């Protein structure tokens, strides 16, 4: 303050001058001791001035720098101008120098001379002129000679020869390139350029003579080189073309050959002139046309002889070999060409560019390539018929296949197979007797054919050639023998090669048994690689194959538990065994089974010999017509085998599947089985054959397992051998056996409740699956289950086909459920064919031989695929919606416990709805027996329907349409109509309708329900179902689309944690399927069992199981009744929840359930209700069954459970419907568990619970809820429409909450997971709250 005051006072008088002027540095220093405001002002002025000066100086410097830049740019511009001047000068000088070459001077000299001459007297001019003219003319002539190249006037103009000077001047004077022989002129500006006047041009005259002569020689050599190059180019061109043609079946190779022939003929003229050059071109082409022809003829003969053994083994091998040989000829062609072309010599090099592509082979092989390939296609068959030759050729062909990348050559082999293999299949139809053996060799790899049988054969052949390469000929042969067309060749190869092939197959089977031990690992690798390779060709099929090969690989591990059963597969299907190393592991048993398979193959061979009568067995028509019994049966068994590999791949039916796989993967075994079965088929019917296959697969396949199975298997065999009544009788027996085995299953299920689903699954797998395998063999429901399983896999596999295939899968699942035997007889073939139709959307593109391949590959492609779904439907039968299950089967297959569930369920569902029947068997074995016989009747009715389908592509399309006569029945319509309420409102519910309908109507209207869906809601139901199914099968762990679904997915993840408790699912399944017998019906009665049972009865009417399906569904109805709040989720849940949701929910609850379920399963609903109170607390499982109706009181528990998700939905949903939340909670838990992989789980489950509580009568809606699993949201809209007043608000909340709280559910998903993992009751509350609004929506009504 003092300083301020003082300065102010001091500066007061002088403040203005001090403040206004900038201070000097000296003043600032002086005032530093007594700083004042004036000093601040002065300092500010000083700083401002300094800043301004600095800025001004900076600007000045900037201007200077800009000036420098401008100057620099100007200098640069001038420099560039100089450069340009030099460039212009260089151009000018160069031109001047060139023109200045004596030529310019000469005319000038001439002109001067002329002028001088003019000036002189005429005499003088003449005198002077003569020498000058002579000199000029001579010089000009010299210039013309030296500077110009006088094209041969003789060649150019014969007339101009007379006028030498004129002709030469006027005509063909071409300036010579002076710099051919001499260096270019010096660079302008170079030292030499500056130093020498001629700038490097003056030496021309001295060099002209040598230049001219050199030029002539050089030009000649150049012309020769050009000619050679053109020849070589032509050779390369023809080679390239031939490469393309070779890939294209070398149809155009003849053109190349023709080109080579003509080129050679044209070149022959040149050869006449330039034989010397042609000797050089010999490298690329024959010395002369005659030599080339001789060489080609000899080369063709030799090449054919050499190639046919190598390439003839398979049309594939030949294209491969053609490519490889061509490539090899190009480079390695020395050996082949030495042999092939050794006489002409022509042409290793000639054809190494030419030869491999065009040379020998263009002339010989190219020309004959078509013939060779085609003849190879045909001659392959004869040579392949020669077992030794085919084996040897096979080795060579597979070796070439090895040489050729599986991807690349296989692709072309795909093409060649399209042409060679595909056309070979077409040729196979007539020639398959011939070709099958060849195909054996090429298609040894068909192990992949397991799934793709014929597609696989082509694809697998493409890929199998590489794949079979590891196993090489032996494996390839054995697999090829069995799998030559795995389905087609099985019959045709066996038919054609039945003596040879049978012997070789028997030997090969033995070799396989041996090799499979060693090769099983490689083959397992192969199948995956094959399937992978096949992916390129058949993405869908390969997906299924990959799904199955990979799944089968894992399943094979599980199935390896079934080595005894697997050995049969091993012996019969090396590659399938390869595919299922499960079987590969059991090499010894494989050998034993191989013996069985060999016996079967021998029987097959006899059958095939019989079929040889119609060697066209695989001609689509014949195959479909008479081969349908065998072929379809084979397809069915293939479907089973394919589905079964997956089932066996899955732990669920690993043994049963392994046994099934034995038949399934032993498509040959099945063929062998079919051989036996075919014999029996011929003796009995397809039905018996189907069951023969089952019996055979059950006996042979189950032969090792049949220890427990044999009585039933024998019964099955007897039944299958019995008249077509086998279906009904067999199913009745199966019903009895199924009841027994179901009772056993129930016991084992109870045990599983006690021991946990895993143990039970395994024990059931071993015991029940053996039984169920027997039953399944009896029912072929094992195969229907395996087919469902394949279907389940198929959805996974079929992404493209999924819409149709899934619909087909649903139909097939339902049909399988409806008619396990129908599915055996029909489901396999029709299913295979319908799916193959789907496949052949791809395969038809791939292979023109759609019919044959539809017959074989259809079954094969979708035998595996379809059958997988079929297997899953049996699994799904428990789940009610196996198709949905199949959709979720990938998810299910992911959780082994779920798979085990499936196994148990499959065991139960092995009788197409033994799962349902299992509860029914608990409820009453009578119903099961009744229902199954009814199913057999329906199956008989439907089986003929579908049996017809496979015969024609139309039938296949119909199968794809999943039109069930039963579905068209009024009862089916009524059932569908019940389900419909959900369907029309909900696009997804339509798919869910199928699912739930599949649950309900899988037993009753597997086909009709699907047909009902497809007809009542044709577009939505089928398309949506398939689309949802496709998604679902992709669903694995796909994140649910809706918040609610995501919430459920979160719960699923926690339930996935809960999956550690597999017992719960088993217990729950047993309870859901068994104990719900009482309880689910109670729930159903409570929750609308009337409508559900009406729907069931209506749906059952087609099955003649009106009451039984009601009861039969009551397992589902039980699940549905309970699952309305609870079981319906399990219906969708049981389809998925039992498989997945129940599994995980019961995993959550398994402990409480397991404790209670062992006692409760017989008690059914009541025991389960008490269980579910505990379970409701422990998990949503109790609520799933009981809380739907009994458990509304458990709102509180759901709220605790929902606390996690309740946070999401609690405020709105819990308040609105705690009861709903309880039942839906359980359902959600179940569904969440079910939909651990669920995308649609939350959607489907939430609507399921809503639907359950809204209308227990909507059990069809519950089935729709199963569909809702796919179309959860769509179900919700229905529910909204149903209880629009409260439901809308609730659904606004529910939908909004489902979505908004679904978002919350997303946040609470972790909570749900932790809640499920740790506080399971909380999880139920979450579920309840999640579904609180849906439950309230139902409850509100």
Swiss-Prot record:
UniProt GO MF annotations: phosphatidylinositol phosphate binding; retromer complex binding
Region (Interaction with phospholipids): 937-1341
Positions occupied by motif LFa 17: 1201-1209
Subcellular location: Early endosome membrane; Cell membrane
Span of the annotated motif LFa 8: 664-674
Intervals of motif LFa 4: 482-491
Sequence ranges of Acidic residues compositional bias: 220-232, 250-259, 266-276, 451-462
Record field: compositional bias (Polar residues): 518-536, 1135-1145
Sequence motif LFa 12, residues: 839-847
Region feature (Disordered): 202-405, 422-554, 621-664, 696-739, 751-838, 881-951, 988-1205, 1302-1326
Motif (LFa 6): 572-583
BP GO annotations: endosomal transport; protein localization to endosome; protein transport; regulation of Arp2/3 complex-mediated actin nucleation; retrograde transport, endosome to Golgi
Any Pfam family: CAP-ZIP_m
Region of interest (Required for interaction with F-actin-capping protein subunit alpha (CAPZA1 or CAPZA2 or CAPZA3)), residue spans: 1029-1047
UniProt motif (LFa 18) ranges: 1234-1240
Residue ranges of the motif LFa 9: 690-702
Composition bias, Low complexity: 202-214, 1094-1110
Region called Sufficient for interaction with CCDC93, residue ranges: 356-600
Domain topic, free-text comment: The LFa (leucine-phenylalanine-acidic) motif bind directly to VPS35 of retromer CSC; adjacent motifs can act cooperatively to bind multiple CSCs, although there is significant variability in the affinities of different motifs for retromer.
Function: Acts at least in part as component of the WASH core complex whose assembly at the surface of endosomes inhibits WASH nucleation-promoting factor (NPF) activity in recruiting and activating the Arp2/3 complex to induce actin polymerization and is involved in the fission of tubules that serve as transport intermediates during endosome sorting. Mediates the recruitment of the WASH core complex to endosome membranes via binding to phospholipids and VPS35 of the retromer CSC.
Family to which this protein belongs: Belongs to the FAM21 family.
Miscellaneous comment in the UniProt entry for this protein: In human, WASHC2 has undergone evolutionary duplication, with 2 highly homologous family members WASHC2A and WASHC2C.
Name this protein carries in UniProt: WASH complex subunit 2A
Organism: Homo sapiens
Organism classification: Eukaryota, Metazoa, Chordata, Craniata, Vertebrata
């Amino acid at each position: 303050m003092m300083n301020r005051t003082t300065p102010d006072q001091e500066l007061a008088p002088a403040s203005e001058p001090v403040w206004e002027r900038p201070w000097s540095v000296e003043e600032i220093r002086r005032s530093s001791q007594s700083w004042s405001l004036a000093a601040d002002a002065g300092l500010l002025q000083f700083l401002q001035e300094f800043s301004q000066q600095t800025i001004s100086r900076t600007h000045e410097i900037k201007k200077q720098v800009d000036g420098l830049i401008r100057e620099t740019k100007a200098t640069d511009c001038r420099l560039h101008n100089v450069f340009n001047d030099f460039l212009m000068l260089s151009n000018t000088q160069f031109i001047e120098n060139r023109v200045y070459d004596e030529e310019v001077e000469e005319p000038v000299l001439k002109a001067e001379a002329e002028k001088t001459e003019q000036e002189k007297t005429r005499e003088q001019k003449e005198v002077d002129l003569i020498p000058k003219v002579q000199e000029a003319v001579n010089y000009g002539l010299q210039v013309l000679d030296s500077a110009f190249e006088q094209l041969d006037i003789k060649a150019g103009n014969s007339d101009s020869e007379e006028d030498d000077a004129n002709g030469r001047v006027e005509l063909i004077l071409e300036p010579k390139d002076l710099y051919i022989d001499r260096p270019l002129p010096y660079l302008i500006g170079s030292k030499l350029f500056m130093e020498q006047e001629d700038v490097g041009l003056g030496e021309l005259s001295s060099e002209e003579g040598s230049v001219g002569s050199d030029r002539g020689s050089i030009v000649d050599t150049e012309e020769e080189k050009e000619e050679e190059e053109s020849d070589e180019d032509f050779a390369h061109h023809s080679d390239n073309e031939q490469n393309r043609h070779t890939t294209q079946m070398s149809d155009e190779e003849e053109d190349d050959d023709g080109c080579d022939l003509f080129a050679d003929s044209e070149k022959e003229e040149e050869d006449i002139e330039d034989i010397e050059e042609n000797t050089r071109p010999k490298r690329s082409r024959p010395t002369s046309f005659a030599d080339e022809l001789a060489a080609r003829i000899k080369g063709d003969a030799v090449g054919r002889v050499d190639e046919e053994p190598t390439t003839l083994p398979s049309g594939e091998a030949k294209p491969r070999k053609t490519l490889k040989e061509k490539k090899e000829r190009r480079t390695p062609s020395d050996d082949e060409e030495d042999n092939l072309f050794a006489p002409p010599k022509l042409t290793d090099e000639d054809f190494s560019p030419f030869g491999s592509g065009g040379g020998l082979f263009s002339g010989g092989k190219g020309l004959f390539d078509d013939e060779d390939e085609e003849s190879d296609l045909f001659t392959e068959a004869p040579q392949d018929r020669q077992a030794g030759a085919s084996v040897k050729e096979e080795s060579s062909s597979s070796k070439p296949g090895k040489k050729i990348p599986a991807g690349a050559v296989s692709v072309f082999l795909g093409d060649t197979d399209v042409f060679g293999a595909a056309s070979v299949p077409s040729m196979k139809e007539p020639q398959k007797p011939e070709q099958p053996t060849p195909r054996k060799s090429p298609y040894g790899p068909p192990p992949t054919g397991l799934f793709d049988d014929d597609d696989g054969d082509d694809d697998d052949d493409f890929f199998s050639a590489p794949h079979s390469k590891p196993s090489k000929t032996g494996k390839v042969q054995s697999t090829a023998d069995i799998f030559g067309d795995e389905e087609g060749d099985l019959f045709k190869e066996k038919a054609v090669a039945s003596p040879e092939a049978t012997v070789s197959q028997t030997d090969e089977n033995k070799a396989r048994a041996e090799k499979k031990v060693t090769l099983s690992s490689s083959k397992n690798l192969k199948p995956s690689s094959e399937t992978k390779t096949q992916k390129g060709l058949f993405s869908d099929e390969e997906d299924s194959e990959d799904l199955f090969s990979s799944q089968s690989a894992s399943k094979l591990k599980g199935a390896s538990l079934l080595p005894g059963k697997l050995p049969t597969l091993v012996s019969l299907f090396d590659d399938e065994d390869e595919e299922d190393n499960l079987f590969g592991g059991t090499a010894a048993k494989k050998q034993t089974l191989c013996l069985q398979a060999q016996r079967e193959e021998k029987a097959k061979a006899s059958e095939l010999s019989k079929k040889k009568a119609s060697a066209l067995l695989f001609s689509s028509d014949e195959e479909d017509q008479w081969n349908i019994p065998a072929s379809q049966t084979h397809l069915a068994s293939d479907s089973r085998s394919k589905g079964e590999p997956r089932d066996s791949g899955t732990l669920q039916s690993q043994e049963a599947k392994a046994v099934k796989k034995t038949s399934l993967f032993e498509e040959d075994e099945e063929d062998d089985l079919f051989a036996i079965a075919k014999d029996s088929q011929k003796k009995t019917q397809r039905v018996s054959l189907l069951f023969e296959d089952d019996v055979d697969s059950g006996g042979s396949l189950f032969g090792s397992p049949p220890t427990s199975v044999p009585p039933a298997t024998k019964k099955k065999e007897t039944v299958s051998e019995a008249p077509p009544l086998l279906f009904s009788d067999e199913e009745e027996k199966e019903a009895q056996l199924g009841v027994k085995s179901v009772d056993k299953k129930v016991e084992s299920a109870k045990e599983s409740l006690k021991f946990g689903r895993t143990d039970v699954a395994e024990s059931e797998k071993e015991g029940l699956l053996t039984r169920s395998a027997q039953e399944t063999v009896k029912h072929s429901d094992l195969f229907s289950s395996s087919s469902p399983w394949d279907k389940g896999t198929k959805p996974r596999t079929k992404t493209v086909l999924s819409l149709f295939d899934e619909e087909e899968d649903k139909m097939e699942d339902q049909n399988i459920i409806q008619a396990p035997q129908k599915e055996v007889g029909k489901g396999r073939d029709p299913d295979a064919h319908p799916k193959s139709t789907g496949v052949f959307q791809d395969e038809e593109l791939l292979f023109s031989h759609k019919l044959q391949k539809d017959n074989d590959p259809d079954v094969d492609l979708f035998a595996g695929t379809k059958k997988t779904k079929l297997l899953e439907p049996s699994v799904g039968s428990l789940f009610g919606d196996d198709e949905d299950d199949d959709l979720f089967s990938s998810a299910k297959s992911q959780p082994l416990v779920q798979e085990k569930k499936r196994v148990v369920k499959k065991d139960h569902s092995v009788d197409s709805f033994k799962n349902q029947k299992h509860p029914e068997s608990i409820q009453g074995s009578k119903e099961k027996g009744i229902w199954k016989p009814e199913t057999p009747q329906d199956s008989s009715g439907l089986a003929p329907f579908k049996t017809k389908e496979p015969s024609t592509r139309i039938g296949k399309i119909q199968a794809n349409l999943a039109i069930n006569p039963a579905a068209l029945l009024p009862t089916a319509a009524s059932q569908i109509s019940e389900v419909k309420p959900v369907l029309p409102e909900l696009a997804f519910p339509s798919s869910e309708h199928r699912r739930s309908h599949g649950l309900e109507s899988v037993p009753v209207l597997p086909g009709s329900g699907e047909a009902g869906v497809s007809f009542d809601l044709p577009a939505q139901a089928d398309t949506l179902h398939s689309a949802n199914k496709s998604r679902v099968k992709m669903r694995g762990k796909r994140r649910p689309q809706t918040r609610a679904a995501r919430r459920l997915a979160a719960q699923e993840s926690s339930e996935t944690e809960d999956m550690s408790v597999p017992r719960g699912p088993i217990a729950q399944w047993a309870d859901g399927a068994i104990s719900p017998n009482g309880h689910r019906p109670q729930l159903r009665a409570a929750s609308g069992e009337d409508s559900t049972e009406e729907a069931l009865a209506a749906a059952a009417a087609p099955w003649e199981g009106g009451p039984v399906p009601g009861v039969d569904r009551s397992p589902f109805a039980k699940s549905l009744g309970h699952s309305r709040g609870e079981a319906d989720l399990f219906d969708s849940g049981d389809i998925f929840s039992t498989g997945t949701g129940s599994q995980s929910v019961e995993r959550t609850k398994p402990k409480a359930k397991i404790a209670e379920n062992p006692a409760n399963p017989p008690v059914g609903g009541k025991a389960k209700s008490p269980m579910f109170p505990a379970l409701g607390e422990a998990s949503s499982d109790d609520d799933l069954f009981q809380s739907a109706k009994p458990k509304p009181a458990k709102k509180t528990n759901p709220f605790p459970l929902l606390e996690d998700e309740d946070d999401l939905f609690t405020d709105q949903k819990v308040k609105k419907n705690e009861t709903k939340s309880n039942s839906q909670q359980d359902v959600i838990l179940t569904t969440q568990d079910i939909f651990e992989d669920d995308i649609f789980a939350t959607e489907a489950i939430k609507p399921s619970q809503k639907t359950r509580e809204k209308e227990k009568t909507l059990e069809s809606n519950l089935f729709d809820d199963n569909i809702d699993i796919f179309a959860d949201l769509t179900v919700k809209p229905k529910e909204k429409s149903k209880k629009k007043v409260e439901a809308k608000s609730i659904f606004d909340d529910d939908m909004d909450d489902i979505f908004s709280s679904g978002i919350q559910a997303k946040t609470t998903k972790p909570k749900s997971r932790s809640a499920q993992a740790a506080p399971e009751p909380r999880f139920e509350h979450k579920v309840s709250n999640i579904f609180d609004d849906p439950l309230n929506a139902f409850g509100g009504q």
